[in-house]
Structure formats: structure tokens, C-alpha cells
Amino acid sequence: MAIKSILCIEDDRFIGEMYVRSLHNAGYDVDWVVDGHDGLVAARNKDYDLILLDIMLPEMRGTEILETLRGGEDDLIPNSKIIVLTNFEQDDESRLAMEHNADAYLIKAEITPRKLLEAIAELEAAPPQQG
């Protein structure tokens, strides 16, 4: 799966700017929103190849967004991959996110621009999931 369009849902301005700058420099088309509600609206209104989803967000938690998009009978974003972004302290949240059909998760404290691009490349190379 070729990834071209990315939605970044991240409320930390410094981190969000780093992701967006790195992704733009790598040739991706990136939209960035800073709260959960706007993230959910954006994910529903545009067909993104990848969503970078922070767990701790204002307005709506990342796990709620994931549950809304993929937790029901229908996958509302069947053509999108999701990488959950989490902190060390949120191990249970990471597990919960993966149970709700996230495609991968990254520990925010360990993410560098290079590691982010490597994680995206791994998703691009992965075989399609059978649903």
C-alpha cells in the first residue's frame, strides 16, 4: 500500500510541527489537527492513507476516535492505516488501541523523524490485512 496522504492528530505543537515538517520533506501530503473532535471529523471527511493518532487529546481521547472509526461492525476508514502515538505511562492504552484495530503504535519519547518514516515504510511494505 502506497502511503501519500497523512492525517496527524497531535495536540503538542512542538511534536506536531516536527512530524509535519519531516513528513512534508519526505514528500507526503499532511493535514494536522490539534484536538480529538477535529481529528474525528477530518478522518471521516477525507480518505487518508495513514492517520497518526495521539492517545491523549483534548475534546476526545485517541482511543475514543479509534473505537468510533473501527470499533463497530463497520470499519469507517477501511483504506486508512492508523499508527497510535503514546507515552510510556500508557501501556494499557497502547494494548487497548491495538485491540481496537490500530495498525501499529509508537512510543512518543522514542520517535525521531527517521523512526517515524521507518514505521511508515514498514506499513507500506506490510501485506494487506484480511478482514
Residue ranges and their predicted role:
Residues 10:
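Conserved acidic carboxylate
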Residues 17-25:
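Charged docking surfaces used in two-component/phosphorelay signaling
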Residues 27-34, 42:
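Short hydrophobic/Thr-rich beta-strand motif most characteristic of the beta2 strand and flanking loop
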Residues 35-38, 61-67:
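Acidic catalytic/metal-coordinating carboxylates
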Residues 54, 86:
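Active-site residues of response regulator receiver
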Residues 58, 90:
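The feature encodes the CheY-like receiver
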Residues 63-77:
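Short amphipathic alpha-helix used as the core "switch/output" element in two-component signaling
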